[in-house]
């Protein structure tokens, strides 16, 4: 089974507003960057999309170390999801789970992989997190119709 390192991030200019997501996949010294965006989104949706797109890109089962600065994504997939499913996609307070379609898609994308979800503090000097942050922000800027920066 291939061992892949993944770094993800999402960005939103306003919340809601133009959003971007990005992922960096690393395997055997090779890297692949993925990025995209939506004209009207939220930060949480973009964080979810980054993880979804990274996992859906992989064509075979992999051992994955996935770094995210989103506690929403990490806790959602590792802690909250079993309860949501058990309660018919309701939160512990009885409300419908937000972004359910993305959570279902993320859950499906995780099934063939062995994944360790690792939280990294955002904007704290981690070079890979900073890299995907810039990529995601540039996608959000492009969705707004602005010029991306490096």
Curated annotation (Swiss-Prot):
Residues engaged in binding Mg(2+) 2: 9, 133
Cofactor stoichiometry and binding remark: Binds 1 Mg(2+) ion per subunit. May bind a second metal ion at a regulatory site, or after substrate binding.
Alphabetized SUPFAM superfamilies for the sequence: Ribonuclease H-like
Cofactor(s) essential for the protein: Mg(2+)
PROSITE patterns in the cross-refs: RNASE_H_1
GO cellular component: cytoplasm
List of residues binding Mg(2+) 1: 9, 47, 69
InterPro entries the record matches: RNase_H (IPR050092), RNaseH-like_sf (IPR012337), RNaseH_domain (IPR002156), RNaseH_sf (IPR036397), RNaseHI (IPR022892)
Enzyme Commission number(s): 3.1.26.4
Stretches assigned to the RNase H type-1 domain: 1-141
Keywords of this entry: Cytoplasm, Endonuclease, Hydrolase, Magnesium, Metal-binding, Nuclease
Chief subcellular location: cytoplasm
Single GO biological process annotation from the record: DNA replication, removal of RNA primer
Keyword Metal-binding set for record: yes
Assembly and binders: Monomer.
Protein name: Ribonuclease H
Species this chain originates from: Xanthomonas campestris pv. campestris (strain ATCC 33913 / DSM 3586 / NCPPB 528 / LMG 568 / P 25)
């Amino acid at each position: 089974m291939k061992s892949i390192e993944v770094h993800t991030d999402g960005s939103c200019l306003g919340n809601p507003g133009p959003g971007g997501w990005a992922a960096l996949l690393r395997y055997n010294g090779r890297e692949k960057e993925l990025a995209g965006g939506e004209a009207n989104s939220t930060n949480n949706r973009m964080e979810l999309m980054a993880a979804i797109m990274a996992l859906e890109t992989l064509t075979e089962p992999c051992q994955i170390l996935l770094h995210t600065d989103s506690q929403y994504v990490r806790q959602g997939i590792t802690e909250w999801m079993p309860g949501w499913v058990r309660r018919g996609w309701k939160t512990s307070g009885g409300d419908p789970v937000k972004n359910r379609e993305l959570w279902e898609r993320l859950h499906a994308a995780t099934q063939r992989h062995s994944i360790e979800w690792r939280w990294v503090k955002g904007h704290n000097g981690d070079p890979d997190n900073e890299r995907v942050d810039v990529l995601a922000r540039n996608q959000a800027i492009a969705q707004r119709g602005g010029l991306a920066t490096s």
